Amino acid sequence: MRAQPKHYELKLHDVTLLVHEWEGQGDPILMLHATGFHSRCWDQIIMLLPNAHIYAVDLRFHGASGAHGNVDWQLMARDIEQLIDSLDLQRVLGVGHSLGGHLAARVAAERIERFRALVLIDPVILPRDRYDTAPELATMTADMHPVSRRKNQWRDSDEMFERFRNKPPFNNWQPEVLHDYCAYALVEVPGESYLELACDPLHEAAIYLNQAGNNKIYDLLPNLQLPITLMRAPAVDAAAINLSGSPTFEGLIDLLPQGKEIYLPHMSHFIPMEDPELVAKTIAELDAQTSASGIG
């Protein structure tokens, strides 16, 4: 069992990010979480990689990191670039889920000299034609999106766990992962007896809606000349708001020159939460292939 990580606040140009570091051997692994979550959702996976040197960060607008500025995916990508520079990370194995997968691909393409490989877990890299609807989404305000109406007053993390454990999609998660999510998902509200979500539901909704400019990822994909493992769940009707379906372009693997796809038809978008053992095994295998020491 791994020791608890070191954690520290990393001050960037206009925001402070909370970083967790599990010290270990070999080249670093950097983990980026999905929209609405936080870095400690990786804990069960990290425990299965006992010797690896791992960094996990709360993205801007999430967890204990700052929420300064307007929601913008490019802004969050720049945060990760600055984090890599500030910590002087070299030969990074980037691991990203959903939003984190998009950011990992984008940052690696822009800063390829810092990366050795990627594990992209159901990344939000939409089919090209879906980005054509970005102007339509931009006309919808965050308070119009269903996730903006999430329950946002909680007694404690135990109440949250009990409420979610038998409800989709959480009922398909490993209980330990759900516990980790709930344990770090809430923050105190000054002057109030209840807790609120660390990721404001309005910020979460705005992230889903703000796809403008994200089609740039297709211009960057040719830069990804490095080993990539793509884990993908089944897609759903693009017209439906279903956060359990895969947002990933089904033909993405054909655009990744050194890509290997693991298609998981029996799973939902929440692959790391449903099968942390599989994700840890996938990371360890790619780490062994690309790290000088081959640890995992």
Give the residues covered by each predicted segment.
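Conserved hydrolase catalytic core segment
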Residues: Q90-A134
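Conserved HGGG/HGGXW glycine-rich cap/lid loop of the alpha/beta-hydrolase fold
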Residues: L18-G66
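A catalytic-pocket lid/entrance helix-loop region that shapes and gates access to the active site
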Residues: I121-W154
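Hydrophobic, aromatic-rich cap/lid helix
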Residues: P175-D219, A235
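Conserved loop-alpha-helix segment in the C-terminal half of the alpha/beta-hydrolase fold
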Residues: P222-M267
